[in-house]
UniProtKB/Swiss-Prot annotation:
Spans traversing the lipid bilayer: none
WD repeat ranges per the UniProt record: 15-54, 65-104, 109-148, 154-193, 199-238, 253-292, 301-337
Pfam families: WD40
Keyword Repeat: yes
Family membership: Belongs to the WD repeat CIA1 family.
GO biological process: iron-sulfur cluster assembly; protein maturation
Function statement: Essential component of the cytosolic iron-sulfur (Fe/S) protein assembly machinery. Required for the maturation of extramitochondrial Fe/S proteins.
GO CC annotation: cytosolic [4Fe-4S] assembly targeting complex
Official protein name in the record: Probable cytosolic iron-sulfur protein assembly protein CIAO1 homolog
InterPro entries, sorted: CIAO1/Cia1 (IPR028608), G-protein_beta_WD-40_rep (IPR020472), WD40/YVTN_repeat-like_dom_sf (IPR015943), WD40_repeat_CS (IPR019775), WD40_repeat_dom_sf (IPR036322), WD40_rpt (IPR001680)
Domain of life: Eukaryota
Length: 337
């Protein structure tokens, strides 16, 4: 079901096995960014066509911006910018010019490791989260400079990830405190719209929306995947929307956490990666009123922990998945249905 078509070392050499934390596809599907413990961000090109041998070629290494491991990378929705978040407590924005990315902004203020940074759908806002338990909202002005819009501390522990709704300025965060939080702009400030405690037993490691933004999946330390659905859709005020858990699946025969979850925008397949070095696929079956999370199986492996999985967002390449691992590799997979 998932066929490995390539293995690539983040640092370029087989003997360099520094941990790879994350990969992120450009929205056009032909560019990939990766980051890891080597303090560098690398930009790759996807070479080839779906009916031929495809591979990744490293085109740029950005290694002058951070002094500690780079935990996350994300492209802006217009494709012009790339953002990285680091354990050095900084966030760096790179801008693409003549096909190359160069640093244009360094955002500082978090008190400790920044775990995630991601642009909103409109690219007007940038959200960051940190080990300091805070979620920051940055706003971009006409000169493409960023200023702090709001600082919230809704969690009681390390905030692991933030993710934007695919069509709205709605943000969700997940944390070491076993909870997820939703945020909206109330016209003056960003505010917490909903709190859901006890989502998992232990850390909630990762979150992902479906294409329409009506469903959300989470994975956690308890090796469980959980499905949430949006209620009150179509209400006069979007801030009346609430989310509730409707299904869960507990992965058996493992004691390891699930670290990452990604929802395929074309075929609705969900991928996870975890501490047992395995990649799993899931699908939501049954009716919307009675959904069931179906485990399609273990479909891929690494030598060490799988820290992140990411589907290609371009429909032409939507069957491509990348995985990032402690073993120092980025693996390229093809979904065969």
């Amino acid at each position: 079901m998932l066929r490995q078509i390539g293995e690539f070392y983040h640092q370029g050499e087989k003997d360099d096995t520094s941990r790879v934390w994350m990969t992120c596809w450009h929205h056009g599907g032909r560019i990939l960014a990766s980051c890891g413990d080597d303090k560098a961000v690398r930009v790759w090109s996807l070479v080839g066509e779906p009916d031929s041998k495809m591979r990744l070629e490293c085109r740029t290494t950005l290694d002058d911006s951070h002094t500690r491991a780079v935990r996350s990378v994300a492209f802006s929705n217009d494709g012009k910018c790339l953002v990285s978040a680091s354990f050095d407590a900084s966030v760096v924005v790179y801008q693409q010019e003549d096909g190359e990315f160069a640093e244009v902004n360094k955002l500082e203020g978090h008190e400790s490791e920044v775990k995630c940074a991601v642009f909103s759908k409109s690219d007007e806002f940038l959200a960051t989260c940190s080990r300091d338990k805070s979620v920051w909202f940055w706003q971009q002005d006409e000169d493409e400079d960023f200023s702090v819009s709001s600082i919230l501390q809704p969690h009681t522990q390390d905030v692991k990830q933030v993710a934007w709704h695919p069509t709205e300025d709605l943000l969700v965060s997940c944390s070491y405190d076993s909870s997820i939080r939703f945020y909206r702009f109330d016209g003056e400030d960003w505010v917490t719209q909903q709190k859901i405690d006890g989502c998992h037993v232990g850390t909630v490691w990762s979150i992902a929306f479906d294409t329409e933004g009506h469903r959300l999946v989470t994975v956690g330390e308890d090796h469980c995947i959980q499905l949430f659905v949006r209620e009150n859709i179509g209400s006069k005020s979007a801030d009346q929307d609430t989310w509730k858990s409707v299904a869960r699946y507990d992965v058996e025969n493992t004691r390891w956490p699930l670290y990452s979850v990604a929802w395929n925008s074309t075929n609705d397949v969900i991928a996870t990666g975890g501490g047992d070095c395995k990649i799993r696929l899931f699908k939501i079956s049954s009716t919307p009123e009675s959904p069931v999370i179906e485990h399609l199986g273990v479909v891929g492996r690494h030598e060490l922990d799988v820290n992140h999985v990411a589907w290609n967002p371009n429909p032409k390449f939507s069957n491509l998945l990348t995985s990032a691992s402690d073993d120092g590799t980025i693996r390229l997979w093809e979904l065969e249905i």
